[in-house]
């Protein structure tokens, strides 16, 4: 009798253990089929190592890249990185180092920018051996000046942040436990104990918790919606921002992939770099695998219960391992990753956003007589832009400089900016 009881207990434990192991494999996408898919091409490789986060100013046409030369995660040594500026109207896409005069240890992770008047506030997560910090900079033109370093016990395991203005922001902590069995439980069992913290310029307060590996975060100003990536649960969590900056949970979006950083296009569609297999990513991050698969998705979020998810890119990691961010611009996608020696500028055959004003608003005030619009290869007057039905637009491209523009038109003069529009056939 006792022997039978012990056997039942033993087999029950084995069954529970098998269920736990199976859950780990299933919930992390281990069995997911990876198929190389992208309707487009690689426009350029930008030689910046570990370009983990990228954000774009759609109005001023530049990208800020946060990069750290990682060898494996976690690291035992101080890593080195920087912030970079890329002019998106210059088709050479030459990165400019912004932080070469920043003398503190600097291994940036998530970043955010906020424009006020003619300057930008740039905030960056900074991982150092002395602790976790948030660095605040001011960007004027292409000159970045460090303003202050923020340190607090609530900045515990910071991953990403989003600025509301030059002083206030939300940020994510991706873990509650730094090490030990509970840290492993967060990674492998999906223990949901990470959080979102709000900083009002003076005080820190937790505004959301119970998240499995809180990662990328972004804020839709018009709708007052905060989006938080939970890659361990394959979710994007949606919150309503209240007047007092507390958050009200709305719903989870099941993305079926390990969502990472969140960016917006001009129509506030979410663009997300993602890890379709978290176990493969974990092995890659630790140095046990040479590559890990990459995925890019976009989410058109309308309201609670009404949204669509579209896969834009997937591959096995041979071209780009472990994609973390997908920042859209026109029909380009700036796709960053964890540890590759370069990030990719992808050119989609699809128009990513069908709004044209973001181009005209930037160019026209500063180049009143130096803008050329081409519609299907023929010059078009600016006032005729509004006559083009958005649904008929296939692509929009921006070219700057006499050399580039001469490929498309006989008008060859310095300072010209050409906006080429192609319609659906």
Outline where the language-model segments fall.
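Beta-strand-rich domains and repeat architectures in extracellular enzymes and scaffolds
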Residues: 43-81, 339
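Conserved blade-ending motifs and adjacent loop-strand segments that build the rim/top face
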Residues: 43-47, 52, 251-263, 304-329
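Surface loop/turn motifs at the tips and blade-to-blade linkers of beta-strand repeat domains
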Residues: 44-48, 97-104, 149-154, 206-212, ...
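Short, conserved, GDST-rich strand-edge loop motifs in beta-rich repeat architectures
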Residues: 65-79, 125, 171-191, 272-293, ...
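Blade-loop segments of beta-propeller domains
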Residues: 70, 78-125
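Asp-box/WD-like beta-propeller blade repeats and closely related beta-sheet repeat scaffolds
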Residues: 103-110, 114-165, 172-179
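Loop/turn-rich, solvent-exposed surfaces of beta-rich toroidal or solenoidal domains
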Residues: 256-312
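Short, small/polar-rich motifs associated with maturation and membrane association
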Residues: 355-425
């Amino acid at each position: 009798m006792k022997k039978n009881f012990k056997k039942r207990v033993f087999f029950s434990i084995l069954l529970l253990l098998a269920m736990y192991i199976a859950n780990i494999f299933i919930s992390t996408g281990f069995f997911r089929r990876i198929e190389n898919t992208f309707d487009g091409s690689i426009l350029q490789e930008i030689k910046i190592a570990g370009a983990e986060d990228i954000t774009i100013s759609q109005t001023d046409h530049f990208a800020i890249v946060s990069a750290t030369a990682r060898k494996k995660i976690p690291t035992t040594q101080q890593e080195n990185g920087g912030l970079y500026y890329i002019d998106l109207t210059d088709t050479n896409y030459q990165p400019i180092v912004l932080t070469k005069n920043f003398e503190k240890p600097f291994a940036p992770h998530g970043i955010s920018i906020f424009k006020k008047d003619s300057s930008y506030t740039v905030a960056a997560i900074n991982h150092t051996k002395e602790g976790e910090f948030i660095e605040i900079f001011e960007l004027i033109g292409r000159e970045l000046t460090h303003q202050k370093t923020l340190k607090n016990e609530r900045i515990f395991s910071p991953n990403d942040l989003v600025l509301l203005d030059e002083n206030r922001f939300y940020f994510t902590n991706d873990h509650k436990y730094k090490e030990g069995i509970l840290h492993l439980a967060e990674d492998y069992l999906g223990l949901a104990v990470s959080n979102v913290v709000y900083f009002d310029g003076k005080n820190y307060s937790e505004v959301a918790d119970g998240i499995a590996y809180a990662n990328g975060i972004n804020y839709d100003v018009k709708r007052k919606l905060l989006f938080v990536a939970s890659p361990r649960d394959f979710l994007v969590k949606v919150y309503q921002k209240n007047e007092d900056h507390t958050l009200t949970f709305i719903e989870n979006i099941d993305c079926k992939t390990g969502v990472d950083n969140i960016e917006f296009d001009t129509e506030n569609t979410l663009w997300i770099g993602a890890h379709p297999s978290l176990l493969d990513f974990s092995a890659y991050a630790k140095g046990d695998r040479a590559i890990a698969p990459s995925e890019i998705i976009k989410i058109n979020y309308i309201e609670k219960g009404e949204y669509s998810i579209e896969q834009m890119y997937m591959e096995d990691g041979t071209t780009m391992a472990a994609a973390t961010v997908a920042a859209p611009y026109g029909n380009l996608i700036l796709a960053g990753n964890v540890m590759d020696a370069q990030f990719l500028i992808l050119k989609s055959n699809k128009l990513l956003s069908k709004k044209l004003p973001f181009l005209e608003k930037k160019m026209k005030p500063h180049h009143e007589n130096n803008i050329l619009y081409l519609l299907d290869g023929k010059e078009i007057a600016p006032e005729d832009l509004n006559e083009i039905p958005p649904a008929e637009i296939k692509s929009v491209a921006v070219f700057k400089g006499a050399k580039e523009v001469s490929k498309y038109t006989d008008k060859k003069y310095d300072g010209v900016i050409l906006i080429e529009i192609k319609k659906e056939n």
